[in-house]
Amino acid sequence: MKIYLVGGAVRDALLGLPVKDRDWVVVGSTPQEMLDAGYQQVGRDFPVFLHPQTHEEYALARTERKSGSGYTGFTCYAAPDVTLEDDLKRRDLTINALAQDDNGEIIDPYNGLGDLQNRLLRHVSPAFGEDPLRVLRVARFAARYAHLGFRIADETLTLMREMTHEGELEHLTPERVWKETESALTTRNPQVFFQVLRDCGALRVLFPEIDALFGVPAPARWHPEIDTGIHTLMTLSMAAMLSPQVDVRFATLCHDLGKGLTPPELWPRHHGHGPAGVKLVEQLCQRLRVPNEIRDLARLVAEFHDLIHTFPMLNPKTIVKLFDSIDAWRKPQRVEQLALTSEADVRGRTGFESADYPQGRWLREAWEVAQSVPTKAVVEAGFKGVEIREELTRRRIAAVASWKEQRCPKPD
């Protein structure tokens, strides 16, 4: 029996990145031998065991053979005669097909070290094409390591295009697509994930609402980048700089979906695109089974982001009604989320990357003023039932009006 550290732990250590999870491969052993040594078996489809002390995963070396469609259609073979090289060959990318023995020596049968040095994401073997999930995984790795200068090897991108063209992605479940997307949204450069999907044709299959934005023009006066798809990825990039939250980043990604519905004869204007985009947000989220909280914020951002841009023009009643509409009294975090997504929208434009966004500050200030109006005083004044809410709203509007007169510049 020989034990090797494999995969991501080896890769990230060589890149000088923090190692989170460690996975091990056991060569020359059997399930019974592992159980006798005190390991606990957890894998049902193939033999994976938990170490009795560290609880890290130890898998018997195995090979995989395609036996059906999609990413689950594989038959595994695990036996003492399966070599380390056999096991590493089934992995997706060469930089993930690295192993380290107990002396610290790196075993690299597929030139993963060379690709690591050259910052290349390259598939190990043609078997890559048998698993459609790998298209999403490579896009996610491209996003995760973009800041280190990694790019996808030409032959790997070509294979990803072929897989997409042959309909392999249609076998992916919504849950797996969302899981990979959610993970990509946590990276430093989530926009790279969607750009890679577009480069291989997968965006059209998995995110048609986003793909439809490319080639749709916006007024050059407001959008020097012109193309709404490019603007969408620029805003996502900006959102990633402004917030680590997945819901903020996803909402930013979806903020302009309504522009894809504008008839070409009305281009480059997109009047009413915000509310129009709400149904597309709902459609996308229902298809991918996006969690409700994330979906709800995306709907609100699509509907109201343009309203925030015009904040100095809003009357106090409209501002308080906005807080009602986003349910800010129960979910106050939405004010900050809406401020961040709206700022990302403005700064996600060519030449505006460092622009100030005072509307975000005014929104936050108005919220502090509105929420500081005490409910207790209204009750103590003798108001009852529905009158309490009406009087509370009236006082909030008055407070915001007073603040706006002093702090918010009047529109020209």
UniProtKB/Swiss-Prot annotation:
Its cofactor is Mg(2+); Ni(2+). This is Multifunctional CCA protein. It comes from Escherichia coli (strain SE11). Transmembrane segments: none annotated. GO terms for molecular function: ATP binding; CCA tRNA nucleotidyltransferase activity; cyclic-nucleotide phosphodiesterase activity; magnesium ion binding; phosphatase activity; tRNA binding. The keyword Nucleotidyltransferase applies. One of its GO terms (biological process) is RNA repair. Mg(2+) binds at residues 21, 23. It comes from the Bacteria. InterPro entries: CCA_bact, HD/PDEase_dom, HD_domain, NT_sf, PolA_pol_head_dom, PolyA_RNA-bd, tRNA_CCA-adding_enzyme. Keywords: ATP-binding, Hydrolase, Magnesium, Metal-binding, Multifunctional enzyme, Nickel, Nucleotide-binding, Nucleotidyltransferase, RNA repair, RNA-binding, Transferase, tRNA processing. Signal peptide: none annotated. CTP binds at residues 8, 11, 91, 137, 140. The keyword Nucleotidyltransferase applies. It holds the Pfam family HD.
